[in-house]
Structure formats: structure tokens, C-alpha cells
Amino acid sequence: MKPLPVSIATRPRKYTPLSAYACLSDRNKFISVVFSFFFVSSSERVNMSEPEAEAQREPRDSSKKKKKKKKEKRKISEEEEKEEEEREQEEQVEKEEEKSESVLMRGIFKVGKKSHDVLLTPTRLTWTPIIPESPTGEESVVQAGVVLLQDVFAVKVKRRRMAGQQSGGAVLGLALFHSRRRGRRLEEDTLHLHNASAEHTHSWYNTLKELLTGFSCRPRYVKVFINPSSHKKEAVHIYRDHVAPLFKMADIRTDITADGTISVVPLFRLAAIKHTQPLTDRKGHALSVMKECKLDEYDGVVCVGGDGSVAELCHALVLRAQLDANSPENPVRAALPLGIIPAGSTDVVSCSVHGVRDPVTAALHVVLGHLQQVDMCSFLSNGQLVRFGFSAMFGFGGRSLARAEKKRWMSSSRRREYAVVKTLVRLRPEDCQLSFLPAKSSGSSLFGQQDQGEDKELDTKSAEESWVTNQGLYLSISIMSIPCLSPHAPQGLAPNTSLDTGSASLIAVGNASRSEFIKHLKRYSSSSGQFSFPFVETHSVSAVKIRPRSRIGWSEEESEDEGDSKNTPIIQSEAAALPWNIDGELVEIANEVLIRVHPRLIALYGEEVHEAESTVTCSCI
């Protein structure tokens, strides 16, 4: 081992207390230095004790030292050569991996103002600048460009046309439209390949088109639902300005259902859209349309709207699958994937599969056919299906939404802040019996990865033994099968769950003071810590039952005087309906609610993300 310089060995070291590995590394270095020191100095101590013998062995030792130095130099040079060979081998492996695919086409195009050698393989397109050899023979560093075909969604032939000319024109080359990732966003980008040869250009065009048609997950014909009344009534403009051009460029045919009172003629001119019938945006409208649609004609469904529109379409797709499979009792996996173009106020589901509220990102996920399997929940009361959804809030979340729905004339931000503050002022717990079935470690093994998303019946005895039941006062109970990311909660309302784990996150907030509960709510906007309170418990579950015992209907609560009723819930008649927030929609239920998780019940256009962009702040707490 080569000894380290004394200056390095004696240099004082600074240790980072938070990094045990750094300390361990320094300790190992210190041990090696000490070992080297003793190894070298041992001979010195012997030599000091035997000066006469040293004088006799000096010529012989000096020759040995020279030989050792030569050997060490050889070893060092050999090690350097080995390292260099390893680097070259790694680079060669990378190059071989790129070249292992058969080269389909090779040609010369101008990229920018320089000529490039362009290679096309079944998975990528690369271009390398053509640089003349230097007179001195020195090789210049050449940086090649690459675009994966999985990111390319369109290829067009570029032509020069005169003013008023509708077709034909001199061929200029090709334009490849592809996506480029910037953080969580997907952006449209264009690669221009210039070549004036019509035969050469069309040959490349035909080959590229054939390769792009090989991506079977990409939709060719989609059913589009637009909710013109969502949020700021911008859904039509969002679709026209951001989504329709991308669909047209990717040769995706669309069939739009929108409000007949909204003029959508510009959409038709822009994207060659076929519009079947104008319908209103009433509740249940998507469900009625989905029941009559011939779904086998489409490759997917696209929703332009907020969380309410998304929840209604997901519910409709699963119900339609049950109807087609003649399975009224067991949920069936939706036949078509759903694309979500965010046009609402929070867009929780969109953020959970895109990580950002951006219509271009959402549209590119649809165009490129990025599919993500997602779990859903069924909500039943008295044995009857209430609806399918992704999340539900009982207690604080339900009462806040009930108050917000009464102030529809306000803007969404003011309405939300008013509802939160008012509910905090009149904060009261719910006395209920909470039962849950813990999820197995294998995630979706409880219901199994069965075809069509059907549930397997559980053994009654074992199921009863595994249920965990608690009874008490709860300020809030949330059940979420997805993380529920949003700009208000970048890490999600349920950061301990995922999109396709086959389980849901149960978050039960027990009775606490108003100030402690507000601290809990504030933690959602930060990175972590919202579950570190003693009154908050979380569980990974596959089923939940909530049976209210003492309750008050939200309509009756509004008429009561304010008072300190934090510890004593007001008991009303058994028929009083309680507000539930299911996917942002207000649902009033008077009896026990059973929530069950169904693995991968629907496919959404998007991908798994763990954090959303934080662009919105709430000043109400």
C-alpha cells in the first residue's frame, strides 16, 4: 500500500455528525495511514538499533529499494492501464448496446446549419455532426444527439409553399415532434432534419410512420368530455388552445361531448373533430352518455374538467364494465383508459398521475400512451352501491365541503377558505365506530390480481377475526387509495400510499384541541410531520366500515348557535344525513358506510409520481 503524504495524514479532519458513513470512511483512511506508518517505520526502528548492520546492508538495500520503486511504478502503471481498459470497455459496452440494434436507415441531413450523419434504429434516432479531418490528425470531441422513438408522437414532411398554395410544394426535409421532460412537466419539442431530396425524405418518412404505429398503447380515436362550467369556465379554451393541436398533430380522431350552449365551432376547424350531439353538463350526464356509447369504437376517453367530472367518468366507466360483463355484484376493470386534462380548482387526481396541473403535460401523456394502473374504492351503504371513487373524507372534510357548496356564488378560492375557517370555528368531533381490515404485506393480495378486477369472496370467519374495531370521537376520517397530490399538499394527503398498491390509506384524527388540529392541517403543506401527532393514526387497509353513533346533519348544524361543543357531539334523529366528501363531490349518507379497495380497477393516462408542484398557498390557516 502506498503511504499517504504526511501533510494529508496529519491534516485535521472535520466529521459530519449526520453521516456515519463519512466517519467510517475517514476511520478506514486513518487506519490505512496508521498501518502504512508502522509498516514503514518498523524498519527504521530496527535500523536505529543496529547502525553497524545497516552500514553493511546499505548498498544492498538501496538496490532493493530501486527495484521496489520500479516494481511499484510498474504496478501503478499497470493499475492505471487496467482502469483505462475498464473505462474503455464500459464505453464500448454502451456503444455496443446502441449498435446492437439493427440500423434501419442511415442518411445525411442538416440539423441547424451543419450536416449530420443520422442513424435510425427500431428504438431511437441519433445524429452526429460530420467534421472534416484536422490537418494535424487531431480528433475533435463530437457530441451526438439522440431522440427515443417512444418520445416521438408525430413526423411530418416539410415543404416550401407559395402564398395561397394548399398542397404540394418543394420538399425541405422532415420535422419530428417529440416530448421533452423538464422536471415533472412534459414539453413539446421539434427536431428539424433538412434534406432537399424528395425520394430520400419520403423513404425516411414512411419508415418513421411505420415505427410509430407500432406503439399499440397510443390511442387513435378517443371520446372527449368537456365540462364548460368547471372552475373558471376555461375548459373549452384549454382544450382548443393546448390539447386539440397536439391531438391533431398526432392524428388522433376525437368525438366530443360538451355543453350545447357553448360555441365549439373553432374546435372543429382546428382539430377536425366530429361532434355527435350537444348535451348539457348536468350531474349524471357522463353516466347517461357512457351507458349508450359504443365503447369498442374508441381507444380511450378524455375528460377536460375538474375532480367532479373525473370522478363521474371513472364511476361511469366501471359501471359500464360491470354492465357489459353482467356482473352486478363484483366490480369489473374499466375497458378503456381515461385521460385527464386538468381544468378544475384542485385537480387532485390529475396531480396524482401527472405531478403538475398542466394541460400540455396531460395531453402528451395521452398522445404517447403512458398508462398507469390505479386502484379504486367502492362505497356501499345498506348493501347498495353509492359510487366508485378514489378518496373519501368524513367529519371535517365532509362538513367543509357541505359549507362550500352553499356558497357557490363565491370564487373557488374564497369559497374554500370560508368553508375551512367556518368549520374550524365550529369544530366538533364525530362519535362513531371505526372498523378496518388491515392490508396484507403483499399489497393487492387480499383481492388478488384477478382478471377484470373482480373481488374474491373472503372467508367469513377469518375476515371477522382480522377486522380491527375502534370506537370514539374523531375530528376527521379519510380513506384514500391514491396519494391525492395537489398544489396545496405537494406530498399528498396520503403520502404513505401509492397508485396501485392494492390498499388504501386510513387516516383517523382523534379528538383534539382546535390549535392542535390546525397544526396538523398546516403540516400537509410541508414535506412531512402531519402524522406525528399523538391523536393521529394511520393504517394501510383493504376495507373500512364507519358507523356513526351520535350525529348531526350538516343542514341542522348551520342553524345552530355557535358554542363549545368540542367534547359533546349533538345527537339528532337516526335519519339525519351526514356529509361525505367523495372525490370532491358532496354525498349525504345517513347509515353505515363500507369502503372496499379494488386493485387496478382503472387505467389512467399518466405515470407514478411522488410529489406535485407547489404553486398555491392557502391563507385561511
Give the label of every model feature segment.
Residues 2-5, 11-16, 21-26, 39-304, ...:
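ATP/NTP phosphate-donor binding region
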Residues 475-516:
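Active-site beta-loop-alpha substructure in enzyme catalytic cores
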Residues 114-122, 479, 497, 593-597:
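Broad, structure-driven detector of short, well-ordered beta-strand segments within folded domains
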Residues 369, 419-438, 501-577, 581, ...:
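Catalytic phosphate-donor-binding core of small-molecule kinases
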Residues 103-105, 110-114, 139-141, 157-161, ...:
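Eukaryotic intrinsically disordered and solvent-exposed regulatory patches
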Residues 52, 236-237, 241, 250, ...:
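Catalytic core of DAGKc-family lipid kinases
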Residues 247, 251-264, 585-586, 595-621:
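C-terminal helix/juxtamembrane-tail motif
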Residues 10, 123-126, 132-133, 181, ...:
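Conserved beta-strand elements of beta-rich interaction domains across eukaryotes
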